[in-house]
Amino acid sequence: MAMTIQLDVVSAEDSIFSGLVQSIQVTGSEGELGVQYGHAPLLTTIKAGMVNVVKQHGEEELIYVAGGVLEVQPGHISVLADTALRAGDLDEQAVLEAKKRLEENIANPSADFEYAEAAAELAETIAQLRLIQKLRK
């Protein structure tokens, strides 16, 4: 049996996941990161994207996160996300509409337009779409 480690994924609103896992994959500030039992202690920021969780008995669960912090300690992994949603809770139609609206705003900016903010929101919606597409496979 594979070695396991405790994982807690929480957002400001809710606890999304808590349990023993074999490993997780997440997008950190420096790129893709895999964590499993025995990983060196680590603290890094995370980007909008998917947390791929391999649970204790090998089942996979996908969680969308947008911003936050990943902390790895001996025996424990914490994902403290600004936003976190189970992949199944994402509404594809709403995400597609948000993406279209953001692309239109970027193409035709208003006087009080904040490009950096719009680009960050667009990156989040694209990450959500990637996760939805991965769920379909």
Swiss-Prot record:
A cellular component term from Gene Ontology for this protein is: plasma membrane
Native organism taxonomy: Bacteria, Pseudomonadati, Pseudomonadota, Gammaproteobacteria, Alteromonadales
Record-stated family: Belongs to the ATPase epsilon chain family.
Pfam families, alphabetized = ATP-synt_DE (PF00401), ATP-synt_DE_N (PF02823)
Q: Which UniProt keywords apply?
A: ATP synthesis, Cell inner membrane, Cell membrane, CF(1), Hydrogen ion transport, Ion transport, Membrane, Transport
Q: Where in the cell is it found?
A: Cell inner membrane
Which GO terms fall under molecular function for this chain's record?
Answer: ATP binding; proton-transporting ATP synthase activity, rotational mechanism
Q: How does it assemble?
A: F-type ATPases have 2 components, CF(1) - the catalytic core - and CF(0) - the membrane proton channel. CF(1) has five subunits: alpha(3), beta(3), gamma(1), delta(1), epsilon(1). CF(0) has three main subunits: a, b and c.
Record organism = Pseudoalteromonas atlantica (strain T6c / ATCC BAA-1087)
Q: Mind telling me which PANTHER family this protein's record contains? A: ATP SYNTHASE DELTA/EPSILON CHAIN, ATP SYNTHASE EPSILON CHAIN, CHLOROPLASTIC
User: What are the disulphide bonds in this sequence?
Assistant: none
The protein depicted here goes by the name: ATP synthase epsilon chain
Show the NCBIfam families listed in the entry: ATP_synt_epsi, PRK00571.1-4
Supply the InterPro entries for this chain: ATP_F1_dsu/esu_C_sf, ATP_synth_F1_dsu/esu, ATP_synth_F1_dsu/esu_N, ATP_synth_F1_esu_C, ATPsynth_dsu/esu_N
According to its UniProt entry, the function of this protein is described as: Produces ATP from ADP in the presence of a proton gradient across the membrane.
